[in-house]
């Protein structure tokens, strides 16, 4: 066993100090160290060791992956629990370290508390670091676990924090604060990931941005209660930590029983947030479960018809969808039980004879005959009190003892920790997927878990509910391996890496107003690559903001995601449908690039504009987007980041998003480079001198294509590889 373990991948090194008998500590997480000898690793640890001064313990105090007060750590403890008030402080002694090419398994024991601990630490080939722990009780009686959090250290140069907040229709809104002494705690008690989750908690050097600064990010991969923390203390320690937020009495370990934490993911960016984000994207794209076939163009019926289900109307909508190039048609809420509005029917997962007297077969036949897949909306974790299921099994609703929580959206939470309720839902979904040709489920979750306990026992049940949902998704995917599933939760209320281990797409927000979607999708993509982010073209007037937006802006925003349409196309003009078909065709042309290339964001000084691009080996697409008026008239230049500095690129506007729609163009003032001929510049010139921004009206987008030029002078096509 090595005293110091060095893991390295994709430009990242992690050095773990396993000397002594206490829990190991990370002494380096950052840029790759290259080939280093064991002597150099020892000197690295020596160089990082502090002087032993302070008052919590004689000798130097270090922060381990699981910090303990018994080691002199007076910050947030990694473990909290007890045996009837005893064994409340842990003191683990390391019993073994097992190493592999990309990971370490640390084993430890607290003999007095009779607890065994196993910590997995892995450095993925993408450079993403992840860790989790398993705690096992080895004594008779019950060990009541309060929390088990793991920590990753960050250096003293991290002086700023970035995390996220939000609400329905505005998820993942960024907020920055100084990283000062003390503890910053972000708790999610909603029973789902939450609109306002910390999402990716980042610590970075002063002024870190998209393309500059050193930055470390941490994501707690759990879809229930979670706690994410950043702590800096007067001993010079700084760390990010996270784990599950447990409610009182949720986890009691009997002899031989274990609890496993969620995975904690860390990513490092030596050159800003794009670098950090790219590692997350590489990690997700490397998974065997990652969707590898082209992401189909989706038409969802929700904002087109809401609850007005009618075979004739939906047939016409399906025909209109097919005419613009749609490849998947999704029937949203309203097809089952008494579900004519959002006040009843949840839980009654039987096709409604009132609106579908012949079942869903006729509509599915229409959709399939038009060459599209069929998808269906479900909300398996919820129940309306006004439903046949609730009347038959009132004890299946989650509650704090005999007191039901307040309803939200006229619904309660179905207790999937109850085996009978779980089996009912699993069997009904299995039956639907078996009976009908369904390729896709939009899996919704439309309320927070409030007073979410098991009615039979009165105990808190968020932990059990979350793991039951994971098990349900796993079982259904095993039974129907070809069916894709979207994670939706009142929009973007459940976006995390653990739900994405079981789903193929996330719905970023119920707001599809492109003005709101520009920042929302930018920050969602900090963790999630574009092919997993559902992004739809809405109606000319947004249903959630009442903002009017031109079609090119709506489609240009949706292009940078998994493209779809949520608009009553039967009411659209023929000109709009023709224009939409052009955007669909462009998405189909570019989706190979968009969904495999490197996502980049410019650091734009002008707050009215943003630059988003995807760069492949020989092709790139950029969106220059204005969401406000600029204080410069005309605006200045912007860099196109991420291109090969030594290659020459043919840069020109990309139809149909090729019109610099603004006052200058309206008055006949041309932007010199913005012609079909464009300009030919090196990636170095484009990444430094850049391009002059167009004068754009607010909420307009200009697409820019950059194609590498062959030595003979011709553009290299995508078929020659990106």
Spans of features found by a protein language model:
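Active-site neighborhood of glycoside hydrolase catalytic domains
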Residues: 357-359, 391-393, 397-552, 562-571, ...
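Aromatic-lined carbohydrate-binding/catalytic grooves of carbohydrate-active enzymes
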Residues: 292-427, 440
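Carbohydrate-binding surface patches
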Residues: 11, 604-645
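Polysaccharide-binding surfaces and accessory modules of carbohydrate-active proteins
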Residues: 3-6, 12-14, 25-231, 648-666
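C-terminal beta-sandwich/jelly-roll accessory domains of carbohydrate-active enzymes
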Residues: 416, 629-722
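Glycine-rich, aromatic-flanked loop segments that form ligand/cofactor-binding clefts
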Residues: 57-90, 207-225, 267-289, 326-333, ...
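Short Pro-Gly-centered flexible turn/kink motifs
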Residues: 251-269, 698-705
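Conserved, mostly hydrophobic/aromatic
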Residues: 11, 133, 256, 299, ...
